C-alpha cells in the first residue's frame, strides 16, 4: 500500500477517535480498510468501485468463508471510511452503500439510519443565532446560504467578496462549472461584521477571507471542527453516534441549501447552476441561464434565518 494511502487510513482512524467511537472500533475499522486496500492494490482506495466491492464480498464469503455477521461488520467499516472520504471531499459518492443495500440484509434493516441529516429552517436559525463569534457566524451563514463546499470556502480571499453585488468569486476547480455565487442580505450582514474586525486578526497580512487565531488561512479541518462544535452545542450533532443522521458537518449545509431550495419550488436547473454541478450531457451546454433571473430567483427562494 502506498504511503499516501497509509496516511489516509491513519487520518480516518484519528477521525474515528474525534467522533468518540469505542477504542475497539477505532482499531477494527482502519484494519478492515487496510485489508480491503491490500485486496484492490495497486488501485487507490479513492478509486474503488462497486465491482471491486462485489469481488471483495465474494472473496470474504466464498474464499474466506466468513460468517454473514462478520462480513456485515467489514462492510460497515468500509461504508464509514467512504463516508469519511465524502466528508473530506475526496470522493462524491459512497460506493459501499449500493452493495450493502443489495447483498447485505443488515443494511436493509438500518438503511434509514444512514441518511444524511437534514435540519429544518427553524433549526438552522437556532444554529446561526447561537453563534457569538463574528467569524464563525459568517462561515456558517455562507455555507448555508451559498451551498459552497468547505474547500471552496477556505480558499476564498478577501478580494473574492463583492459586498455591493453580494457575490463570491470562487477559485476554479474541476468539481464546479461556475465560479460566481450569490448571497443574500443576512449573509452580507454577517460578512460585514466579520470584515470589520478581520484586520485585527490579520497579524501576518494573509489574503484569506477567513483567518485562524494564528492569523493564517483557516483550513478545512478548522471549519469542520467549529461547525460540528456549534451544532453539538445546540443538540444537532452527536459525535459519539455511529449514525449518519445524528451528525452535522459543513457538508450538511450544502445538503440543507439544496433541499430547501427544492422544497421552496425553485427551478432545478437554477439549483444545479447555483451548486455548480458539472454538466454531463451535451445539450446542457446550450442551456444558457440568465444571470439576472438566476439572482432574482435565488433571493426569492433562499430561506431567511432571522439574524
Model-derived segments and spans:
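C-terminal secondary-structure termini that scaffold catalytic or DNA-interacting sites
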Residues: 1, 301-307
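N-terminal core-binding DNA-recognition domain of tyrosine recombinases/integrases
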Residues: 10-24, 30-110
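DNA breakage-rejoining catalytic core of tyrosine-based enzymes
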Residues: 91-93, 104-125, 175-186, 202-206
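Basic, Lys/Arg- and aromatic-enriched nucleic-acid-binding interface segment
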Residues: 121-150, 177
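Conserved tyrosine-mediated DNA breakage-rejoining catalytic core shared by Y-recombinases
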Residues: 155-190, 281
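C-terminal catalytic core of Y-nucleophile DNA break-rejoin enzymes
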Residues: 173-193, 205-229
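Short, basic (Lys/Arg/His-rich) helix/loop patches that form interaction surfaces
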Residues: 224-269, 273
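Catalytic-site neighborhood detector that most strongly recognizes the C-terminal catalytic loop/helix
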Residues: 275-300
